[in-house]
Amino acid sequence: MKIAVEGCCHGELDKIYETIQFLEKKENTKVDLLLCCGDFQAVRNEGDMKCMAVPMKYRQMQTFYKYYSGEKKAPILTIFIGGNHEASNYLQELPYGGWVAPNIYYMGYAGVVKYRGVRIGGISGIFKSHDYRKGHFERPPYSKDTVRSAYHVRSIEVFKLKQLKEPMDIFLSHDWPRSIYHYGNKKQLLKKKDFFRQEVEDNTLGSPAASELLLHIQPSYWFSAHLHVKFAAFMQHQNNVGEIPKATKFLALDKCLPHREFLQIVDMEHDPSKPECLEYDLEWLAVLKATKDLLNITSKTWNMPENNGLHARWDFSMSEETKREVLDDLGHDIKIPCNFSVTTACYDPNNPQYKRMPTHIVNPQTTEFCARLGLVDLNVKVRQHEEEKEDFDMTEDNEADSIGSAEDPGEYSTDTSILSTSVNPDEITLEDDDEQEDEGIAEKLGEPSPEYTPDLSVNFSNIRVLPDSMAVSSDDATDSTNDELDRSESSQTEGEGKQSNRPLKRMSNENGSGGVKIKRRNQAIYQAKDDEDE
């Protein structure tokens, strides 16, 4: 089975599908599945754009709305995770995952699915320590703070993923696992992105939460994006005595722009007896059921259960009996139903509604999913909490009028002052102040990076300092780290044997025999300072 892996989408669905179709015709092959590693930008209308953390002048509708309305249909089954430039209000409707359009599936805050026997896991968002232990409390209309915190990874998702025991074939994250750069060609990476140097040397680049998952899950492949550079690494895991050694092939890809390495084809073994449809993963569903009482929908910090004598249960890994119970709940049908439905008005280019406000809808897909498994819809719970809070505030106001009290309970206040240090009003790129690249630029200019803010309340006990013997020195003279993934085991770039093993770049003047001309519609926006600000 051939799987296309794409880095940051940035709403360029048409261009990505055109590129894959061009490749299929050129190489006389067929791509079975597309995986997108975040910044998908499933924007349906003008209200959704207001929920996307990008500078105002870069808010563009792009073409997803055509796939949402049914004007177009994705030619390839597409699975994606969220990044840090998303229509968060829409993705928030599907906390457990679901169809954002026909043939386009979102994995939720975290999730695991199967396709033709290949097990695919993923986690959405990027890591920020100050929001990590909070709940998913955000809801539209977002403030300037919550429009960013909405896409920050939460500890509950990492905790649930760490309960998994069955082997994982593919795992997706938007930001890189911290320390993964020690397993690839750092010299070549820093040649392309010199402003990463200090963070690489300090071992602060990337997500410690993703690194913890990498050490626990040990998937065969791990794909990421976010830093807008192609980078390959090979990590041999340290296993216990008697266990079969495992290794992970890591690949990060660029964003969808001309002359950029944003797409790669990977060959994967699959089960030909399995149907060509997306299926639920029983172990993951069992974990969701077991951890439903751990949900936190407030901005208060919340510690996950540990084996420290304070919790009655801390191990939520699943037995075969529990998975059979989930199978019974599903009526022994693990196929993910194609139950997409339009839930809001779609953008009309002939009648734009710039004053349209964001919507916060209880999606029928989530309602159906929760009903089948006895889960809690986070959107319903957040809405109920807001209503209760409003009633409480009204009561407090009435009491204040009668007794002269000016006390404010402030239950929903969120301290995000840390974000203010990285605001760059002159930024002319899609990246907002939360992007690690911009933080690297700040380092280059001699300014303190806001990314590495020690938070002693967050304990990543499983993150280890990588041994020198397993790290690739930044002085290594490897010709191309981008070939490492291709050389390891059976992974191949599409077209191997016919041409050089290099990932597909989209050329702005590229024309194949089929007459496909691939040129980015909004390319002019990025040309001026693309290389220095990416």
Swiss-Prot record:
Enzyme Commission code: 3.1.4.-
Domain of life: Eukaryota
Cofactor: Fe(2+); Zn(2+); Mn(2+)
GO biological process: mRNA splicing, via spliceosome; RNA splicing, via transesterification reactions
SUPFAM superfamilies reported in the protein's UniProt record: Metallo-dependent phosphatases
Documented activity regulation: Active in presence of diverse metals including Fe(2+), Zn(2+), Mn(2+). Also activated by Ca(2+). Binds two metal cations in two adjacent alpha and beta metal-binding pockets.
Biased amino acid composition, Acidic residues: 388-400, 428-439
Biased composition (Polar residues): 413-424
Keyword Membrane appears in the UniProt entry: no
Cellular-component GO terms for this entry: nucleus
Keyword Nuclease set for record: no
Keywords: Hydrolase, Iron, Manganese, Metal-binding, mRNA processing, Nucleus, Zinc
Ranges for region Disordered: 386-439, 469-534
Enzyme class: hydrolase
One Gene Ontology MF term: RNA lariat debranching enzyme activity
One Pfam short name: Metallophos
Biased composition (Basic and acidic residues): 484-499
Localization per record: Nucleus
Entries under SMART domains matching the protein: DBR1 (SM01124)
Main location per the UniProt record: nucleus
Entry's family note: Belongs to the lariat debranching enzyme family.
Role played: Cleaves the 2'-5' phosphodiester linkage at the branch point of excised lariat intron RNA and converts them into linear molecules that can be subsequently degraded, thereby facilitating ribonucleotide turnover. Linked to its role in pre-mRNA processing mechanism, may also participate in retrovirus replication and have an antiviral cell-intrinsic defense function.
Protein name listed in UniProt: Lariat debranching enzyme A
Organism of provenance: Xenopus laevis (African clawed frog)
Lineage of source species: Eukaryota, Metazoa, Chordata, Craniata, Vertebrata
